[in-house]
Amino acid sequence: MAQDTALHLPLGLEPAGWALALLTSSIIYLFLSPKSKSPRFPVVNKYWWDFFQAKAKRDFEAGAEDLIKLGLSKARTKPRREYPRLVLSDQLADAVGMDNRFDQDKGIAPVNLVTLKGFESMYAGALHDSVPRPATSATSKRLVHLTRPFSEETTDFLQREWTESPDWHDIEVYPVISRLTAQVLSRAFVGPRLCRDTRWLEIATTYISNRLTAVVAVQKWGAVLHPIVHWFLPSCRRLRAQNKRARELLQPELDRIKESPLEDETFTSLAWIHGYGQGYIYDPGLAQLRLSAVANHTTSDMMTKTLIRICENPELIQPLREEAIEAVRGGGLRVAALQKMFLMESVMQESQRLEPFILLSMFRYATETVTLPEGTTIPKGTLLAIANPSRLDPAIYPDPHKFDGYRFVRMREDPRHAHLAPFTKTNSTNLNFGHGKQACPGRFIAVNQIKIALCHMLLKYDIELVEECPSQLVRSGLVTVRNPGAKIRVRRRQEEVCL
């Protein structure tokens, strides 16, 4: 039988210091939805005497990955207890991912607080909630037209932020990458005017952390008080003000779209959603905030980790440059050129294999009782998620804890594992983008955007790690990030080809 366990994750943890860790608090709450009905599986991190969950909170924040491993190992024995969230092994990812009876929206609903004013951007069922997936898919189909605009925004950003100076200077990695990602993706989301507007970029880079801060603040109070306290909490007021500001900034762009519909060459998801939503009442500001929440954080995290990995392994820099030069020479920086960059993709994928942003994936809700092919029965109402132990399976990845930038290049040449090599092809060993029918439709955009950015960075700049600023992994609950204070040192160099 596949391994599965019910993982007891404590409610109300608020990590301090920086915004990314706030996501942990929301995920903790999600795992303790009191309305869920879990099957009889082993429970970990639950103590009968821990009435206020103090020990459970500390243990989860410090060692969520170890708790997941413990739960999966316990699942080899007879199921014995009940608790809210069921954690399944990735052996069941195919079955869960392809079954429509496991609902994604309801799987993450406990953290959304969607009935409160200001939190509506995640509201399940509203048009501004249902539109991001088809809008993202539509954007992915325009990648051939978006490659040049993405490159233009990357050039503009690096000239301003990394400068043209030939002297070494320090760059704080995550904040800079977050701003770069926001500007580039906003070119596809809201167009060339707003993508460089500092007012919009401030919203794009802070919305998700502001929302999560507000969620944590509300969750400190009993559920019966939520409809009242949110009106007075400063974080909730800031969130409502940010929603209002987003609408104000988007309205002039919407007016232009109504007067002159955009062609593929100037495609924006804002224009696409406007056409998609004809005849419906919807909030374009909330729709764009939802897209930003989905895209900016995870893409920035992936690019940050990849860039730091490259700096930690400087022997990769020249081969990566040579691959990019060979791919770009003759045809320019096009989708076809990006698809030839197998080493760059391997480095990105190896980084994500070892450093997934979230240790669990595929959060789902069972809308009816489901018996999986291997015999596990999931009762109706169960909240579940998928762990990904296969990413460290030595039978698939020899020496699995070692970073190997060429790992997936070699896998492409191995008939046994060639199907696992493409980064954007989801499978049970690679759940970074989810899996199955509800896999992330924006993964093609994210991978292309990161490749474009890395081409510009590596060809135009010398880069090295600033050793005095620790760049180690920081774990908080389910979230794994690089130290937000990590820095690299850069200086301008002459690129060999024109980008």
Curated annotation (Swiss-Prot):
The keyword Calcium does not apply. It comes from the Eukaryota. The chain crosses the membrane at residues 11-31. GO terms for biological process: alkaloid metabolic process; secondary metabolic process. The keyword Ribonucleoprotein does not apply. Its cofactor is heme. It is a single-pass membrane protein. Pathway: Alkaloid biosynthesis. Heme binds at residue 440. GO terms for molecular function: heme binding; iron ion binding; monooxygenase activity; oxidoreductase activity, acting on paired donors, with incorporation or reduction of molecular oxygen. GO terms for cellular component: membrane. It is found in: Membrane. Glycans are attached at residues 296, 427. It holds the Pfam family p450. It is an enzyme of class 1 (oxidoreductase). Keywords: Alkaloid metabolism, Glycoprotein, Heme, Iron, Membrane, Metal-binding, Monooxygenase, Oxidoreductase, Transmembrane, Transmembrane helix. Its main location: membrane. Its EC number is 1.-.-.-. CDD domains: CYP503A1-like (cd11041). Notoamides have been shown to exhibit antitumoral activities. Notoamides A-C show moderate cytotoxicity against HeLa and L1210 cells with IC(50) values in the range of 22-52 mg/ml, but the IC(50) value of notoamide D is greater than 100 mg/ml. Moreover, notoamide C induces G2/M-cell cycle arrest at a concentration of 6.3 mg/ml. Belongs to the cytochrome P450 family. Cytochrome P450 monooxygenase; part of the gene cluster that mediates the biosynthesis of notoamide, a fungal indole alkaloid that belongs to a family of natural products containing a characteristic bicyclo[2.2.2]diazaoctane core. The first step of notoamide biosynthesis involves coupling of L-proline and L-tryptophan by the bimodular NRPS notE', to produce cyclo-L-tryptophan-L-proline called brevianamide F. This is Cytochrome P450 monooxygenase notH'. It comes from Aspergillus versicolor. The lineage of its organism: Eukaryota, Fungi, Dikarya, Ascomycota, Pezizomycotina.
